[in-house]
């Protein structure tokens, strides 16, 4: 008899190649069930069906297949404990050498629209996690593979160790497996927490944990003396872990942080309107809407071309040749878009070091933000609230035209993604100046206006927080600003409104603050 492997996978990537090499090169016998067994048989690979091996048929519509002593005994038996081996012999159980399992796609299922609880429940794997955990527990004696990316490393282990695996490799695979089952259970727990009546008032669970599988070791963190890694949250690639990198150097920690900030800004703009955001150090230095994608990029770049050098570019439409030509005219770190046509890709390849990423679903982002503090975590719902202009208040004598409201809305969308205290000066739905991260609001106002220069005349000013005094309003008016949008809520709102009326400005209060720290 050859060595025994159990194969039971939902993701069949690399399955046939692995199975064929196990059988032909290393003389394994395969136990399998359900769709996995059928795939192997269709490929002409010999399979022992689980039901034939255990003597028990699948029951309950396939809910019970591998939960059997002949399976779990073969996994959990300690090969160096005589009584365990006697138990195997007494019960006609063969020890397993390898277990290859991946799990039902629970997270992919609940991510779909209009999924019912009944549909979600059917994608909660029971037998898979049981086998994975059992094998990982007994890593001293057998190997577990929970992801197709480990198939080739496993085969190399066999070749390097005369058909065996090293203890270090088995222990590493056990650790990866426990991390996977932890993340899987966390996803299920989070889903059920979201179903409770309290979830509508407080969408955060009473127990919050963070789990991730290392996707890539990064060269360093924010600075060269800081180590860093990139982890995939959950069991399935989503967001940036599902993005395609068309070209360019390896992504850095800072690249990924900036890319996520860029993604958050660009999804504020409807895909029907070509839009571009350019960032440095997570703050936008140029954001614009255009009639074409190339125009949107050029407007955003020219808004602050000095800061845009070496920036991160986010586009809300697929890259076309005209936009690609514009992108190659200067040094950029990264470009992200929902797509890129073949001709555009050829043009971009002239700048081979530029990292070009394709993220079709730009709107797929985290529902919470997490900060680590000494002794704990701070978790909050992401600031994804959609502002409703119909609820805004025009508090000045001068009333805005529809065109002015569109300009104010543009600036407001950008200000939401600037570090507080945040001020954005814009015109023609293009940023002209951004004041970020100042300790007093009027300081940010002055920086934004200074960057805008003479172009500020006839422009608009957006503030992520209220004005504690009327000095910001007066400074803006002196530079030629015609309209201001801010949340309101200051004890001295009346002073700012009075100043706006005196100076002939439009002022709109949104009633919603957007601090960003």
UniProtKB/Swiss-Prot annotation:
The lineage of its organism: Bacteria, Bacillati, Cyanobacteriota, Cyanophyceae, Oscillatoriophycideae. PROSITE patterns: MGS. Keywords: Hydrolase, Multifunctional enzyme, Purine biosynthesis, Transferase. NCBIfam families: PRK00881.1, purH. The keyword Transferase applies. Belongs to the PurH family. The IMP cyclohydrolase activity resides in the N-terminal region. This is Bifunctional purine biosynthesis protein PurH. GO terms for cellular component: cytosol. Its EC number is 2.1.2.3, 3.5.4.10. It comes from Gloeothece citriformis (strain PCC 7424) (Cyanothece sp. (strain PCC 7424)). SUPFAM superfamilies: Cytidine deaminase-like, Methylglyoxal synthase-like. Residues 1-146 form the MGS-like domain. It holds the Pfam family MGS. It catalyses: (6R)-10-formyltetrahydrofolate + 5-amino-1-(5-phospho-beta-D-ribosyl)imidazole-4-carboxamide = 5-formamido-1-(5-phospho-D-ribosyl)imidazole-4-carboxamide + (6S)-5,6,7,8-tetrahydrofolate; IMP + H2O = 5-formamido-1-(5-phospho-D-ribosyl)imidazole-4-carboxamide. GO terms for biological process: 'de novo' IMP biosynthetic process. One of its GO terms (molecular function) is IMP cyclohydrolase activity. Pathway: Purine metabolism; IMP biosynthesis via de novo pathway; 5-formamido-1-(5-phospho-D-ribosyl)imidazole-4-carboxamide from 5-amino-1-(5-phospho-D-ribosyl)imidazole-4-carboxamide (10-formyl THF route): step 1/1; Purine metabolism; IMP biosynthesis via de novo pathway; IMP from 5-formamido-1-(5-phospho-D-ribosyl)imidazole-4-carboxamide: step 1/1. It comes from the Bacteria.
């Amino acid at each position: 008899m050859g060595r025994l492997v159990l194969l039971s996978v939902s993701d069949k990537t690399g399955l046939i190649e692995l199975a064929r090499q196990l059988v032909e090169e290393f003389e394994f016998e395969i136990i399998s069930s359900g769709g996995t067994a059928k795939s192997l048989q269709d490929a002409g690979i010999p399979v022992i069906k689980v039901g034939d091996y255990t003597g028990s048929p699948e029951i309950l519509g396939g809910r019970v297949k591998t939960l059997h002593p002949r399976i779990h005994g073969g996994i959990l038996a300690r090969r160096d404990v005589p009584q365990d081996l006697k138990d195997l012999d007494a019960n006609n159980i063969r020890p397993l050498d390898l277990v290859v399992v991946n799990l039902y796609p629970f997270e992919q299922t609940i991510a779909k629209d209009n999924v019912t609880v009944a549909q979600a429940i059917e994608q909660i794997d029971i037998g898979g996690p049981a086998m994975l955990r059992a094998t990982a527990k007994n890593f001293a004696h057998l190997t577990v593979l929970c992801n197709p990316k480990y198939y080739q490393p496993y085969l190399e282990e066999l070749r390097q160790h005369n058909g065996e695996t090293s203890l270090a490799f088995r222990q590493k695979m056990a650790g990866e497996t426990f991390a996977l089952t932890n993340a899987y259970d966390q996803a299920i727990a989070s889903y059920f927490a979201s179903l409770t009546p309290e979830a509508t008032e407080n969408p955060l669970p009473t127990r919050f944990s963070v789990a991730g599988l290392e996707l890539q070791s990064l060269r360093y963190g924010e600075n060269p003396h800081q180590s860093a890694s990139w982890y995939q949250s959950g069991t399935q690639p989503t967001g940036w872990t599902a993005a395609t990198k068309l070209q360019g150097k390896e992504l850095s920690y800072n690249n990924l942080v900036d890319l996520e900030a860029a993604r958050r800004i660009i999804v504020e703009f409807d895909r029907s309107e070509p839009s571009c955001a350019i960032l440095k150090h997570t703050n936008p230095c140029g954001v614009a809407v255009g009639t074409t994608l190339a125009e949107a990029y050029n407007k955003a770049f020219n808004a602050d071309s000095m800061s845009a050098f070496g920036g991160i570019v986010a586009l809300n439409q697929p890259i076309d040749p005209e936009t690609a030509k514009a992108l190659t005219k200067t040094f950029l770190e990264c470009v992200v878009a929902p797509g890129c046509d073949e001709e555009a890709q050829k043009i971009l390849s002239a700048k081979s070091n530029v990292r070009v990423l394709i993220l079709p679903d730009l709107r797929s982002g985290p529902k919470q933000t997490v900060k680590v503090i000494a002794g704990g975590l701070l978790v909050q719902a992401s600031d994804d609230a959609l502002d409703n202009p119909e609820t805004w208040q025009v508090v000045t004598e001068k009333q805005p035209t529809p065109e002015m409201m569109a300009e104010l809305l543009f600036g407001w969308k950008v200000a939401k993604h600037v570090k507080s205290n945040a001020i954005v000066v814009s015109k023609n739905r293009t940023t002209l100046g951004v004041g970020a991260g100042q300790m007093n609001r009027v300081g940010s106002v002055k920086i934004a206006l200074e960057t805008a220069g003479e172009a500020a005349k006839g422009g608009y000013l957006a503030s992520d927080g209220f004005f504690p005094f009327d000095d910001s309003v007066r400074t803006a008016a002196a530079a030629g600003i015609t309209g201001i949008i801010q949340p309101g809520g200051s004890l001295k709102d009346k002073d700012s409104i009075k100043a706006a009326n005196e100076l002939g400005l439009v002022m709109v209060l949104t009633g919603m603050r957007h601090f960003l720290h």
